[in-house]
Design a protein with these regions (language model features):
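N-terminal Rossmann NAD(P)H-binding glycine-rich loop of SDR-like oxidoreductase domains
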Residues: 10-37
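Conserved Rossmann-fold NAD(P)-dependent oxidoreductase catalytic core, especially the SDR/UDP-sugar
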Residues: 40-47, 98-152, 162-169
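Active-site segment of SDR-like NAD(P)-dependent oxidoreductases
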Residues: 91, 131-135, 174-177
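Substrate-positioning beta->alpha
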Residues: 111-112, 202-211
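Flexible, glycine-rich beta-alpha linker
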Residues: 140, 166-195
């Protein structure tokens, strides 16, 4: 079916996708791509607010901006969805305390795993998990970010084994760079800093514009 045909459908008949982390740096790009294809995207975040820097972007008026916590998903909402995209995470920073380590594991792993499990219980049969391509020297249990991503990966694998109809796609891009925005809407041009690295190591750096 063409994008135009999907756009012409009434909202009640469109494909509905829940996006946990949908108001974040990468999540907003995913939501935009879904809306562009005529999908009804429910962007879930703890605030439930549309980011200020999107206020003048037409596509953002079509997406649904909802309050939701991936670590405590709304099962009734998921039951109305046809698919799930989960990309909750935090930067791959080193940790120097058990509390910080546990938080890295929870945000990057446990949170996504809970969302995936609840999606299966809600009857969803298609999910997409956005992970990360982690350099070899960082793939160790002592690095909370890597351990968390592995937990999410295992949850996706378990989901795909629920039945022959269940499908899980795991995307593991390199470092995604681009212009970030503060809650105030102010832009931080990190794209100018990381773009030269993408020329030197294109396999490790991905522009958010290509998401």
């Amino acid at each position: 079916m063409s994008k135009q045909q999907e756009h012409n459908k009434p909202i009640s008949d469109r494909i509905k996708i829940a996006v946990y982390g949908g108001n974040g740096f990468v999540g907003t790009r995913v939501a935009e791509a879904l809306v562009d294809r005529g999908v009804c995207a429910a962007c879930l975040s703890r605030s439930g607010h549309k980011p200020l820097h999107l206020k003048d972007q037409k596509w953002s008026e079509t997406a649904r901006w909802c309050k939701g916590d991936a670590s405590d998903p709304d099962t009734q909402l998921l039951e109305r969805m046809d698919g799930l995209v989960t990309l909750v995470g935090s930067p791959p920073l080193p940790t120097f305390s058990k509390q910080a380590y546990d938080q890295q594991v929870f945000v990057n792993g446990t949170t996504n795993a809970i969302a995936i499990q609840r999606a299966g219980e809600a009857g969803i049969k298609r999910i997409v998990v956005v992970g990360a391509q982690i350099p070899f020297f960082m793939r160790r249990e002592s690095f909370g970010y890597a351990k968390g991503k592995n937990i999410a990966l295992q949850a996706a694998e378990d989901f795909s084994k629920l039945s022959s109809e269940h499908r899980a796609v795991v995307l593991q891009p390199g470092m995604i760079y681009g212009r970030r925005y503060l809650e105030s809407g102010k832009a931080i041009p990190l794209d100018k800093i990381f773009k030269p690295f993408s020329w030197l190591m294109p396999w490790q750096f991905v522009s958010v514009e290509k998401v």
